[in-house]
Amino acid sequence: IPALDLLAHAYGALDNWEKTGFYGHQALVLKDKAIPDLEHEIIPTPAPKNGKRIISFSLFGNNSKYIEPAVLNTQLAPVLFPGWICRFYVDDSVSAEAIQRFRNNGAEVIKIGAPLDNWPGTMWRFLAINDPEVEYVIFRDADSIICYRDAAAVSEWIKSGTLFHTIRDSGSHTALILAGMWGAKTGAVPDMQERIQNFVDEGYPSRHFADQDFLEKELWAYIRQNLFAHDRLFDFCNAHEIPGEFYSNYQIAFSRC
């Protein structure tokens, strides 16, 4: 991790938000400058009016660290995100019992098979962006609990009319786009499956960070052109304050379960 990111992370752990913001802002500006403009224009496809609103998760394995927060999210979604549906992209490693628990709470479950099961699993959730029945999609981590500030930020984004949304709420949120803290109007990125497959075929340095590497290298130059950003700390990309009261022991995307 580059030095500026490390400093932002470290001061964030100390709740020194002023220094966190100072170093994180510099880190983000440098990363942004390193991304060239698009070589070829991307033309979004229209999203259906009054289509589904999806909270999209990837899930693999049967570790309770991921299963139980995922179940909790299906319970919280109707309260915090009324009208939204949790959707889980899963492979055969997720038990039938867990899948039934999700469905009992109104969630959708999509089974991933070959060849997509060879992708880094965290990238499956991005497929929702091309679902013709969906109007808006937000991408979240299965082990992070959704919260009212997240919901309020998403509501502001939708009212803005922009294609994309990002959130930053912690000293560790210094990636250009966090894979579990962004959203889009569906159709905003055409041919997502093909784009991911090309990225996977070309090889990637880290399976753990493949989702964020993909977003940064392949899509950030496009996303930043039509973005509504919420950012508590870094004053990056004309960011807006996250609505609602902040509690230092729980940031959006917090995952200490």
Which residues does each PLM region occupy?
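Catalytic core and acceptor-binding pocket of nucleotide-sugar-dependent glycosyltransferases
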Residues: 185-257
